[in-house]
Design a protein with these regions (language model features):
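N-terminal strand-loop element at the rim of the active site
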Residues: 6-13, 19-64, 143
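A short, histidine- and acid-enriched strand-loop-helix "catalytic/donor-clamping" loop
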Residues: 92-93, 105-120, 132-135
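Short, well-ordered alpha-helix to beta-strand connector turns
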Residues: 30-31, 81, 102, 133
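Structural alpha-helical scaffold elements that stabilize or flank donor/cofactor-binding regions
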Residues: 77, 128-129
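Short His-centered aromatic/hydrophobic patch
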Residues: 86-92
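Structural motif
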Residues: 1, 82-83, 135
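A short, active-site helix/loop in glycosyltransferases that binds the activated sugar's phosphate group
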Residues: 133-154
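Short, well-structured alpha-helical segments in soluble
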Residues: 70-80
């Protein structure tokens, strides 16, 4: 089984939403997929027509990220997960490293989301969060080079 934790997922429109949907659907060729995604208008209709097992998290944004992280942690503890995929450093930020050690983890990065001055509190949060992932996947060569300049390990 694969786990996907994302802030960006259809029916919301956008490039990241399409990427995470495509990744999730492609993973179904290799086993079941559980998606934890933020709730969105008309999500029930989308979810009922999807072959994915989608759990939506709603509520105020500040609480939603903690609720989703707790659901993800519990799911990893209770299931045999082959790999976890996170769409953003904030999606892996509140997942305990010890729990992530039960599986392989992949986190996507995008230049806009990691571009914080070296040594700033946001830069430190980004590096600490991404340090938990077994694999950090940049969306471009530019993003990879920016990440290295900002302190990511190659």
């Amino acid at each position: 089984m694969f786990l996907v934790s994302t802030r960006n997922f259809p029916p919301e429109l956008g490039g990241m939403q399409n990427l995470m949907e495509g990744l999730s659907n492609a993973l179904t060729n290799h086993g079941p997929v559980k998606v934890f995604a933020d709730n969105y208008q008309d999500a029930n209709t989308y979810d009922q027509n999807s072959k994915l097992n989608i759990e939506r998290i709603s509520g105020f944004k500040i609480f939603r990220k903690y609720r989703k992280a707790n659901l993800v942690k519990d799911f990893i503890k209770q299931n045999q997960i082959r790999a976890c995929f996170f769409d953003h450093w904030k999606s892996i930020e509140n997942i305990d490293l010890e729990i992530l050690k039960k599986t392989k983890s992949f986190c996507l990065i995008h230049s806009k989301e990691i571009n914080h001055p070296v040594g700033s509190s946001l830069n430190k949060r980004v590096l600490k969060s991404l340090g938990k992932a077994d694999f950090v996947i940049a969306n471009s060569k530019f993003t990879k080079e920016l990440g290295l300049k900002l302190g990511l390990k190659d």
